Amino acid sequence: MNTEMYQTPMEVAVYQLHNFSISFFSSLLGGDVVSVKLDNSASGASVVALDNKIEQAMDLVKNHLMYAVREEVEVLKEQIRELLEKNSQLERENTLLKTLASPEQLEKFQSRLSPEEPAPEAPETPETPEAPGGSAV
């Protein structure tokens, strides 16, 4: 790197950033598509133009990411709303079933829950036809 022609650390940093940006975008575009050498002979206008192109590309990426994130947030909000509604409906149904169940049915249900704790296996057993209460669905 030929940095002796630059007088301030800022000029050196800008030179290094430009070289990095050019090589990065060249690799993205597939090889030596961009062959620009930045030195004292490069005009200020071309440096500014390159800066503007890089900034535009970064803004475009940022805008696309923000749009995608907003879209995903809306989808997740809708899923949360649907789950809250379903949860509320199931809680109302559970309360109704508890009020309609006989003490014997409640006792039988509690006895199934006690030894197994959360009863994921209760629906799998085919012994449920004994309950005279009918289907909850």
From Swiss-Prot:
Source domain of life: Eukaryota
GO molecular function, one term: MRF binding
UniProt KW keywords: Cytoplasm, Nucleus, Phosphoprotein
Sequence ranges of Low complexity compositional bias: 128-137
Residue ranges that the Swiss-Prot or TrEMBL entry lists as coiled coil: none
Tissue: Expressed in T-cells. Expression inversely correlates with T-cell activation, being higher in resting cells and lower in cells activated by TCR/CD3 triggering (at protein level). Constitutively expressed in lung, intestine, kidney and liver, most probably by resident cells from the macrophage lineage. Expressed in thymus, lymph nodes, bone marrow, spleen, lung and skeletal muscle.
Gene3D superfamilies: Single helix bin
Region (Disordered): 101-137
Keyword Transferase applies: no
Chain positions found as Phosphothreonine: 125, 128
Positions of region (Leucine-zipper): 76-97
Modified residues (Phosphoserine): 102
Any one GO BP annotation for this protein: response to osmotic stress
CDD domains to which the protein is assigned, alphabetical: ZIP_TSC22D3
Chain spans, region AP1-binding: 1-60
InterPro entries attached to this UniProt entry: TSC22/Bun, TSC22/BUN_CS
Pfam families per record: TSC22
Quaternary structure, from the entry: Can form homodimers, however it is likely to function as a monomer. Interacts with NFKB1. Interacts (via N-terminus) with JUN and FOS; these interactions inhibit the binding of active AP1 to its target DNA.
Family per record: Belongs to the TSC-22/Dip/Bun family.
Domain notes: The leucine-zipper is involved in homodimerization.
Its biological purpose: Protects T-cells from IL2 deprivation-induced apoptosis through the inhibition of FOXO3A transcriptional activity that leads to the down-regulation of the pro-apoptotic factor BCL2L11. In macrophages, plays a role in the anti-inflammatory and immunosuppressive effects of glucocorticoids and IL10. In T-cells, inhibits anti-CD3-induced NFKB1 nuclear translocation and thereby NFKB1 DNA-binding activities. In vitro, suppresses AP-1 transcription factor complex DNA-binding activities.
Name of the protein in its database record: TSC22 domain family protein 3
Taxonomic source organism: Mus musculus
Gene assigned in the entry: Tsc22d3
